[in-house]
């Protein structure tokens, strides 16, 4: 069988692969996407995860912040994200044993101010919060447009942003030191810190935490995390529509097993025995997966370190603090995520011990967007709950994944139940738990790392070669997935940048 020719072959039909393919096809390139699984979307797919229940959940990725409006406009996507009125709620116990909670709305209001004053009657902590996030927002507004441009050098970007104080505490000083300097409450410090730890197994004093924090706060120039109407699968469906309408060919159940590169072309072989020839090859898979196929050394990277739990609830549980559950779970719900607790559990996990009370955060998609449930389930009061536990590195699951999964679930529930009137187990209709090793098996995330590899600052070092942050050691092979510089999260940014790099190389 003779090999079929394309301008570009892309490995992986995740959202970034679809974004790259559509940009290239709109520029007149012939594009083929090869997807190893029978489902398109990778980590952004929506599935019926609970047998017997008509609920389509975003199994692996949940909220949208990093997807630039420019990509939505360029590709003419009909895709809606919904703002959450509540930013977060963090239950805590006072020294006298009272059950309280820190409520933070999306926009500062009297309820939020009152909640901060329960922690600090002077009002200083609330003012510190407003000042800190106003500075971060200004930084985000300035850096966001550069994410869709060739990488600037560290010096160029620092000069362009021109916020020396903010640059220093976001880029140069350990974020843990900055947080402890700016805030006094252990609870408030923890809420700020969690954005530095999502999917990142690091101490608050490690610069890897700074990088994670930065990406969680700069999305679209606002850092606001929104709910995708219809679930993440709605984004995938739109991307498939615009890709195929632009002429992109997508083949599923086509696992790439070999890549042969010459000075003139790249030859791609799949597990089904098919061969394709292209001028350029883009990998939406993790750099470690690409390296393995090419027979190269895998890049070293941190373990993935999160437990993902999808839950279908018969009803929302009541909280000891007395807050309306529809408020508490509408934003991000933090439990046992004080600054001290996060550091203690990090050190426990680093020492090889499963923490007894995991730091957890979660949100209820259906309070903002009930469309992912059937009308019958909605009418009966059902809700989805997506729980994310921190500091559960893949190494804790290596010896016995099943036993460690059960222990991690017990630990996560212990954290949550501490603040509920009734155990969460009493209101669960169905549940699905994914450890880092489960994520590696299901969607080829190396060691369960949701960012494919360690995140990097969104610039290149002074004196380095100009790049888009998507290049490899082969001029015909590019990274278009989360493992690119400025990758990670649901953003489409590395897909856009890989497409621009290909078009620029011609």
Where does each model-flagged region fall?
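Mid-domain catalytic core of redox enzymes
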Residues: 255-377
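A conserved FAD-binding loop/helix module that cradles the flavin
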Residues: 482-503
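N-terminal glycine-rich phosphate/pyrophosphate-binding loop and immediately adjacent elements
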Residues: 3-142, 303
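Short beta-strand to alpha-helix junction loop
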Residues: 164-175, 219-241, 400-408
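FAD-dependent oxidoreductase catalytic-site/capping-region signature
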Residues: 361-455
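Helical element adjacent to the flavin cofactor pocket in flavoenzyme catalytic cores
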Residues: 215-265
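A glycine-rich dinucleotide-binding beta-alpha-beta segment and adjacent secondary-structure elements
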Residues: 185, 189-202, 355-363, 422-485
